[in-house]
Amino acid sequence: MKFFAVLALCIVGAIAHPLTSDEAALVKSSWAQVKHNEVDILYTVFKAYPDIQARFPQFAGKDLDTIKTSGQFATHATRIVSFLSELIALSGSESNLSAIYGLISKMGTDHKNRGITQTQFNKFRTALVSYISSNVAWGDNVAAAWTHALDNVYTAVFQIVTA
């Protein structure tokens, strides 16, 4: 029990530097421009990193261009993007930190149980940022806001994945 209390404190500490309202606004406005492209986002991740696709039993070993048009692919892409949308919607308000922690904690635990590594999380991040930056107005301010947001999330997730 003590372990979980310490882990919770570490995770809360990792997100103790929440986004400013300006950073949150930049992340939210850029995300709003792409969040309805769920299939394209997941396709971009799988195309860039086939080893991530291989981690999904329902997609492993299948032709990406073929599965991209399937309902199963669209459903899973929507799950991933909806999770990100929920985190982003909560960002920018310190009063939402416990809700953000709860979401990150569950996602981290679920992915730890599936054997997902820090390397795979980082690959996902790279592909996600590549997709967003290629599809929205992307300046240094937007890049910095996304870096801050993802650093917060990934620091917390890595504390869970490596625990």
UniProtKB/Swiss-Prot annotation:
Single annotated GO MF: oxygen binding
Gene Ontology CC, one term: extracellular region
Globin domain: residues covered: 18-162
InterPro entries xref list: Erythrocruorin (IPR002336), Globin (IPR000971), Globin-like_sf (IPR009050), Globin/Proto (IPR012292), Mb-like_M (IPR044399)
One Pfam family, short name: Globin
Signal sequence, start to end: 1-16
Binding site residues for heme b: H76, H111
Note: There are at least 12 different components in Midge globin.
Descriptive protein name: Globin CTT-Z
Species of the source: Chironomus thummi thummi (Midge)
Organism lineage: Eukaryota, Metazoa, Ecdysozoa, Arthropoda, Hexapoda
